[in-house]
Regions:
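Peripheral, solvent-exposed domain-edge segments
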Residues: 1-54, 77-143
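Short acidic/polar micro-motifs centered on Gly/Asp/Asn
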Residues: 58-59, 76
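A glycine-anchored, Pro-Gly-centered beta-turn/N-cap motif
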Residues: 59, 64-66
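A short tyrosine-centered beta-strand micro-motif
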Residues: 68-72
Length: 143
């Protein structure tokens, strides 16, 4: 998942820990079409090492120029629900400067920290629900 926050000036004076400033601009997860199309892995986390541990994200073309913090986050589900463990989040933040002629401001986003709770199983439940419906749709197509 990739989030973007507008620093509203120099990022040295910005605190991303208050307010709903983080806007999700990209996400990648389970993609069954990728496996069917080229025999590759459907999991984004498995594709990452195949891409030399790099990930490309396109910024919105209409985004106004300015200073931003880009937060890329890997969500680890490998130990979820084992021994009471929940999903693992691995964030990394980068200060970036956007140049160009765009004039669009970011919409309201979410608060980080605050959007996730240690006892929140929503991401895990949604993950299994997604797998269930993916399986169900495949099952219906086969019939």
């Amino acid at each position: 998942m990739t989030y973007l926050a507008d620093c509203q000036g120099p990022c040295s004076a910005f605190s991303g820990s208050t307010g709903d400033v983080w806007v999700k601009i990209h996400q990648a997860g389970y993609d069954p079409d990728r496996a069917a199309a080229d025999g590759g892995t459907p999991w984004a986390s498995k594709r990452l090492p195949e891409q030399n541990s790099t990930w490309t994200v396109a910024l919105p073309a209409t985004l106004r120029h300015g200073q931003y913090v880009l937060r890329h986050e890997i969500l680890g589900l490998q130990r979820t629900n084992t021994d009471g463990n929940l999903a693992q989040f691995y964030p990394a933040c980068h200060q970036i400067a956007v140049t160009g002629t765009g004039t669009a401001a970011l919409p309201a986003g979410i608060a980080l920290p605050g959007a996730y709770r240690p006892d929140d199983t929503t991401s895990v439940s949604f993950f299994f629900l997604l797998l269930f419906f993916s399986f169900l749709s495949c099952f219906i197509i086969i019939l």
